[in-house]
Amino acid sequence: MAKSKGARIVITLECSNKSVDISQKRKAGVFRYTTTKNRRNTPGRIELKKFCPNCNSHCVFKEIK
């Protein structure tokens, strides 16, 4: 029988700071991080504060599907 993969899944975190002016950004676009989370411990969507090189500041990154 095959072994289950477990509770860890790969997720994508996207910068949610849309209010930054284009002149303050380093480059256009949206920055994303990939990470893993444990589905059993964190069933809801994750929000982490990380550095966004596009915005050139620390922003809230939200989990996307």
UniProtKB/Swiss-Prot annotation:
One of its GO terms (cellular component) is chloroplast. It comes from the Eukaryota. One of its GO terms (molecular function) is structural constituent of ribosome. Its main location: plastid. InterPro entries: Ribosomal_bL33 (IPR001705), Ribosomal_bL33_CS (IPR018264), Ribosomal_bL33_sf (IPR038584), Ribosomal_zn-bd (IPR011332). Keywords: Chloroplast, Plastid, Ribonucleoprotein, Ribosomal protein. GO terms for biological process: translation. Pfam families: Ribosomal_L33. It is found in: Plastid, Chloroplast. Belongs to the bacterial ribosomal protein bL33 family. This is Large ribosomal subunit protein bL33c. It comes from Porphyra purpurea (Red seaweed).
